[in-house]
């Protein structure tokens, strides 16, 4: 039998998963690595540690699966997006720690660019908002902060990359300096219409083209592993950012299909076809993937606090001992008793984008119990996701037929049922929850002919459970109206 090795490089750990030709998981290996916080608001990773943990778990997964590298048809890479590295092309050594997507050190630069009236230009070309979250301003900071870096970059001595590029460089022994279009579209430097680095944006940020990777398809044979890494040369054949890979792994391959990943936060993506849609509701437009030189696009929105709100019930309020207890506690009451909890602990993301919003609980009476607070917390995850989906439907002009879900919180049946009730469409949980790694495996497998086409891949996608909406639309509208009033009370609370 043939196998695909998926490398899933995340924010807190590096993982490797071996899939067989039926898309069944044969082995998983995982290692955490250090989070580095040099100053408040700064978040870094050691690029060497990312590489060491990733290659380590790859070897471990092959051992656990009981297979040799010669049986691996291809490697697919998926990664934490936006995290920025700069390294020496000759030595392969990073010049600085990786600047992580969560890092806010370039917020002032973004504010200056906005004050200069440049946000509409960036938005129109990249589909993104001008925010420190994305890679472009992080790279500009590195070129400015490291002595001599800009002149060395101009001379072609340095290489920039997001984590996919860094892994491909190391896996190929320094032969490949590439990124796929889905990762490139998260940099603030890539024009999502021309599918190329944008010279006007590069000039604004002072970034030389010579430092940038070549942009490639999300599924294609780019090269192979260097001889001393595994006991065989394995084709490197798939790359995609983690959320786009999850969309592919969920077989959301046609316009209007959507997936929501429920984790610490939520990431919701809707496939919107072969043309980018400019959002009118503060959503991001991104490349979903590029195959055969042709891009497909998605609308994306983020919920900052989802599972993190349940952690707060445990660690902050102490009303549960473990996150797993929240469902039983919330289910012990028939509803939230009129309580709304808006978990805007770090502001609100799309479609509101209000950094000054703060957490709010409204509707409390003497009859309110810990169970009502727990239920309102779970419901807040579904309300925030519903707000995003409504905005996406309006932007795309498409009515959602179903929502495919993944991530740890999908094990919570009460949450999934309430999500279906609010949306009025089925919520579908797949049998394989490792959809991010599966998406990378599918992209690589397609490139080497392990699977014929995307129709065959869609045939492998299997349902674990479908949550059908059971609430009347009038009641759902009433609940969403009440939620909207609660959000208004949370907004602007910490404004100067």
From Swiss-Prot:
Its EC number is 2.7.1.30. GO terms for biological process: glycerol catabolic process; glycerol metabolic process; glycerol-3-phosphate metabolic process. Transmembrane segments: none annotated. Glycerol binds at residues 81-82, 133, 242-243. The keyword Kinase applies. Inhibited by fructose 1,6-bisphosphate (FBP). GO terms for cellular component: cytosol. The keyword Transferase applies. ATP binds at residues 11-13, 264, 307, 311, 408. GO terms for molecular function: ATP binding; glycerol kinase activity. Keywords: ATP-binding, Glycerol metabolism, Kinase, Nucleotide-binding, Transferase. Gene3D superfamilies: 3.30.420.40. It catalyses: glycerol + ATP = sn-glycerol 3-phosphate + ADP + H(+). ADP binds at residues 11, 15, 264, 307, 408, 412. Sn-glycerol 3-phosphate binds at residues 11, 81-82, 133, 242. Pfam families: FGGY_C, FGGY_N. Pathway: Polyol metabolism; glycerol degradation via glycerol kinase pathway; sn-glycerol 3-phosphate from glycerol: step 1/1. Belongs to the FGGY kinase family. Key enzyme in the regulation of glycerol uptake and metabolism. Catalyzes the phosphorylation of glycerol to yield sn-glycerol 3-phosphate. This is Glycerol kinase. It comes from Geobacter metallireducens (strain ATCC 53774 / DSM 7210 / GS-15). The gene is glpK.
């Amino acid at each position: 039998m043939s196998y695909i090795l998926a490398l899933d490089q995340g924010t807190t750990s590096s993982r490797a998963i071996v899939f067989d030709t039926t898309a069944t998981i044969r082995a998983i290996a995982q290692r955490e690595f250090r989070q580095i916080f040099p100053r408040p608001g700064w978040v870094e990773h050691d690029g060497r540690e990312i590489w060491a943990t990733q290659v380590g778990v790859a070897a471990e997964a092959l051992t656990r699966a009981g297979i040799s590298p010669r049986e691996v048809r291809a490697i697919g890479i998926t990664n934490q997006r936006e995290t920025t590295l700069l390294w020496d092309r000759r030595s392969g050594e990073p010049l600085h720690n990786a600047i992580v997507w969560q890092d806010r050190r370039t917020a002032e630069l973004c504010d200056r660019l906005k004050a200069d009236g440049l946000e509409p230009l960036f938005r129109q070309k990249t589909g993104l908002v001008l925010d420190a979250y994305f890679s472009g301003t992080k790279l500009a900071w590195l070129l400015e902060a490291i002595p001599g870096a800009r002149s060395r970059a101009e001379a072609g001595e340095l290489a920039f990359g997001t984590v996919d590029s860094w892994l491909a460089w190391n896996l190929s022994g320094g032969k490949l300096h590439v990124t796929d279009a889905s990762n490139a579209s998260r940099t603030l430097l890539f024009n999502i219409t021309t599918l190329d680095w944008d010279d006007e944006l590069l000039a604004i940020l002072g970034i030389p083209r010579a430092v940038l990777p070549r942009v490639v398809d999300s599924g294609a044979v780019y090269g192979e592993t260097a001889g001393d890494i595994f006991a065989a040369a394995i084709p490197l054949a798939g790359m995609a950012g983690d959320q786009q890979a999850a969309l592919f792994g969920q077989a959301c391959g046609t316009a209007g299909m959507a997936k929501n990943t429920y984790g610490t936060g939520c990431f919701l993506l809707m496939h919107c076809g072969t043309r980018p849609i400019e959002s009118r509701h503060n959503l991001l437009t991104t490349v979903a993937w590029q195959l055969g030189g042709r891009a497909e696009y998605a609308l994306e929105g983020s919920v900052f606090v989802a599972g993190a709100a349940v952690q707060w019930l445990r660690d902050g309020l102490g009303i549960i001992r473990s996150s797993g207890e929240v469902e039983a506690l919330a289910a012990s009451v028939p509803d939230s008793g009129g309580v709304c909890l808006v978990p805007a602990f770090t502001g609100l993301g799309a479609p509101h984008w209000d950094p000054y919003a703060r957490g709010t609980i409204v509707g409390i009476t003497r009859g309110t119990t810990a169970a009502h607070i727990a239920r309102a917390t779970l419901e807040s995850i579904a309300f925030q996701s519903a707000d995003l989906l409504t905005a996406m439907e309006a932007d795309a002009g498409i009515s959602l037929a179903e929502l495919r879900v993944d991530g740890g919180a999908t094990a919570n049946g009460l949450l999934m049922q309430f999500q279906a009730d609010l949306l009025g469409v089925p919520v579908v949980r797949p049998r394989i929850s490792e959809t991010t790694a599966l998406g990378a495996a599918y992209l690589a497998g397609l490139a080497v002919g392990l699977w014929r086409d995307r129709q065959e891949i869609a045939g492998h996608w299997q349902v674990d459970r479908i949550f059908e909406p059971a609430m009347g639309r009038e009641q759902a509208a009433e609940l969403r109206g009440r939620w909207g009033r609660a959000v208004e009370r949370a907004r602007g609370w910490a404004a100067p």
